[in-house]
């Protein structure tokens, strides 16, 4: 492990890293307290599109995580930012619980398609409506393209397969705004006043969390919780800076070796 400049910021994934649905990863709350006691800024980054930022924050606080809304950067926020920049009227293929994060966005007579994780809306009629909009030239905005995610009952399809289906059917390419896009990580770091080389990312997804972060110069720590499967660390090049059992182990390493 190469020597690094002093670490200034830690980005932490949420689902699969700190919690799995309504259960915290064992020891995660105490580990977060120890990390906060160190001379480092902590931010939370997530591709979760199943609920609004406020609902997500409420879930985390019920699990006794000490987190403020300003510390969370979500792919829903990144999607809204792009919608406003492009001044489009999106067809929102997102979970109903995520809609509060799009309050005020004009959706009448849509001229764009925004797709996140929306299991109840991924049926033929709505997907075909999106298909026709794309054929007419509407841009496709993917909140993220995760292949799958972890639920209490096992792994489940993410939005990625549905985004890819629309890309294939319409011969178009989605603009992706969430992890592992470089712009997502840079936006998440913007208020920390530190360079990517002065930050580390902790997550359970080797591609979206670790590879995405390392591609902009951050360190990437892969945890074996959430969606992690055996040998995931061998799927990316370069491999993760560190692969460890869980978030508390990642915090131990940071406190002992990076600060």
Swiss-Prot record:
The keyword Metal-binding applies. Keywords: Coiled coil, Magnesium, Metal-binding. Substrate binds at residues 13-15, 46-47, 179. Mg(2+) binds at residues 13, 15, 204. The modification N6-succinyllysine is found at residue 50. GO terms for cellular component: cytoplasm. It comes from the Eukaryota. Its cofactor is Mg(2+). Belongs to the HAD-like hydrolase superfamily. NCBIfam families: HAD-SF-IIA (TIGR01460), HAD-SF-IIA-hyp3 (TIGR01458). This is Haloacid dehalogenase-like hydrolase domain-containing protein 2. It comes from Rattus norvegicus.
């Amino acid at each position: 492990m190469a020597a690094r400049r002093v670490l200034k910021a830690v980005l932490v994934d949420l689902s699969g890293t700190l919690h799995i649905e309504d259960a915290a990863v064992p020891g995660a709350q105490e580990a977060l307290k120890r990390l906060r006691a160190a001379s480092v800024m902590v931010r939370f980054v997530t591709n979760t599109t199943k609920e609004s930022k406020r609902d997500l924050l409420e879930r985390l606080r019920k699990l006794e995580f000490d987190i403020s809304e300003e510390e969370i950067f979500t792919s829903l926020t990144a999607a809204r930012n792009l919608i406003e920049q492009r001044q489009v009227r999106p067809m929102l293929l997102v979970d109903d619980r995520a809609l509060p994060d799009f309050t005020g966005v004009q959706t009448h007579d849509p001229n764009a398609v925004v797709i996140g994780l929306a299991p109840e809306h991924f049926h033929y009629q709505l997907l075909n409506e999106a298909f026709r909009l794309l054929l007419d030239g509407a841009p496709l905005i993917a909140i993220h393209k995760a292949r799958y995610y972890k639920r209490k009952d096992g792994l489940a399809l993410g939005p990625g397969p549905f985004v890819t289906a629309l890309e294939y059917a319409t011969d178009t390419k989605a603009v992706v705004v969430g992890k592992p896009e470089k712009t997502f990580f840079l936006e998440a770091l913007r208020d920390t006043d530190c360079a990517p080389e002065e930050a580390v990312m902790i997550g359970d997804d080797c591609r979206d969390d670790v590879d995405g972060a390392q591609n902009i110069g951050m360190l990437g720590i892969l945890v074996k919780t959430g969606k992690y499967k055996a040998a995931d660390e061998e799927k990316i090049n370069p491999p993760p800076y560190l692969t460890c059992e869980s978030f508390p182990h990642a915090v131990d390493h940071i406190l002992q070796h990076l600060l």
